[in-house]
Swiss-Prot record:
Keyword NAD part of the UniProt annotation: no
InterPro entries documented for this protein: Capsid_L1_Papillomavir, Capsid_L1_sf_Papillomavir, dsDNA_vir_gr_I_capsid
Spans annotated as Disordered: 501-524
Protein family according to the UniProt entry: Belongs to the papillomaviridae L1 protein family.
Assembly behavior: Self-assembles into homopentamers. The capsid has an icosahedral symmetry and consists of 72 capsomers, with each capsomer being a pentamer of L1. Interacts with the minor capsid protein L2; this interaction is necessary for viral genome encapsidation. Interacts with protein E2; this interaction enhances E2-dependent replication and transcription activation.
Domain of life where this protein originates: Viruses
Name of the protein in question: Major capsid protein L1
Database matches in SUPFAM superfamilies: Group I dsDNA viruses
Chief place where the protein resides: virion
Subcellular location: Virion; Host nucleus
Transmembrane helix is among the record's keywords: no
GO cellular component terms given for this protein: host cell nucleus; T=7 icosahedral viral capsid
Entry keyword set: Capsid protein, Disulfide bond, Host nucleus, Host-virus interaction, Late protein, T=7 icosahedral capsid protein, Viral attachment to host cell, Viral penetration into host cytoplasm, Virion, Virus endocytosis by host, Virus entry into host cell
Amino acid sequence: MVLILCCTLAILFCVADVNVFHIFLQMSVWRPSEATVYLPPVPVSKVVSTDEYVSRTSIYYYAGSSRLLAVGNPYFSIKSPNNNKKVLVPKVSGLQYRVFRVRLPDPNKFGFPDTSFYNPDTQRLVWACVGLEIGRGQPLGVGVSGHPYLNKFDDTETSNRYPAQPGSDNRECLSMDYKQTQLCLIGCKPPTGEHWGKGVACNNNAAATDCPPLELFNSIIEDGDMVDTGFGCMDFGTLQANKSDVPIDICNSTCKYPDYLKMASEPYGDSLFFFLRREQMFVRHFFNRAGKLGEAVPDDLYIKGSGNTAVIQSSAFFPTPSGSIVTSESQLFNKPYWLQRAQGHNNGICWGNQLFVTVVDTTRSTNMTLCTEVTKEGTYKNDNFKEYVRHVEEYDLQFVFQLCKITLTAEIMTYIHTMDSNILEDWQFGLTPPPSASLQDTYRFVTSQAITCQKTAPPKEKEDPLNKYTFWEVNLKEKFSADLDQFPLGRKFLLQSGLKAKPRLKRSAPTTRAPSTKRKKVKK
């Protein structure tokens, strides 16, 4: 709507010797503002830090795992010839994620020597992770992977001649070392990874040989998933039909990369308390692929050749990655880390009495070669020996936990229920059903065959929502100790926090003897 206001301004001019008055009318038009009007956002519930409703005590506990060992084939799992689902030797590689699911005891069922510090009727106890150390055994080493049939056509780095046309099969046996990665990621929920997979095409008439559309997928990182080795985070088994473009340990696997952006933006901050990361890579060699290009090089990008250069070669170039030197000076492991402030709203609180520790360490990826003798002869023959490849890993997890308490007000319980309703169920809080007003039936002879069976079905156990995922289970429910000074990480924590351990031995009271006085002899 346009409002028009007419304003009459009487302007009088008196002309000398003339009885005339001039009146001028001025019209002004008012229009509303055409700028976009932004309304205030709808108020939403605010996510607060755990420090606002969790009170920390001065009680600390140490917990540590046993020596954790893994042995297997670094390239593939060995399955039973009679049963394809039965794994005889698992795949254990230095390029795999190790996702430890650390189980903690319920502090509300913990036997404390003094329980006067909290009220079990109005408060609940939780654990807070304040320190950890991830120990790594075994020497530093570089693991090598490859493919006996790698799709490598020609060397494009220092070629002194134009290559001939590829034949029907130009695959070669080639090995390489991978990108170097060290990673330590801590949270009370499993880490989230990302990878590129096959998407859905909008055009239903697309041919099967066309380049498939790509889609970024998110998934839980499980124990045994492959890391990014330098060839990208993607589903190689789906996107590479020839199974020859990458080494054999990833040609039928999915390489995942932690989705740091998504975990950092998580509202409650449960998946990522903090992380340590170190990556490095350089390119060692340059090759190109054999095969028919699905997307030819445009004609305006080159001038056609003649003779042996009449047919353009493959432009599908690829490098072989390398992680370079490994050294003890750049190690992230075998040293303590203290959590003072998490990057998210969860400041180290272990909801569900569990902790997820995700580890990647490619600096100890040595593959050991084992050999057995088939036939004993005086001269060396290759057929007289069998070669095997194994990879071993060694871990040690140590933690320092702080006991915390939560006062259960109506507001806090509502907030926790909105965050995760399973927490209140684990604390045995739930809705009490109203008493039934209907008449119940009760039989006299409950074992009689003349009536229906009176056995009540047993209650179903609570199903673990993470049961379908694979993690390395570490049970610390019976490995908590309040004597921090008896363990290496506990002593480091006491030293850096300024706390003192309780004395174990009572010192005896010092005894003092009165000085003896000599009597002087008096001469008579």
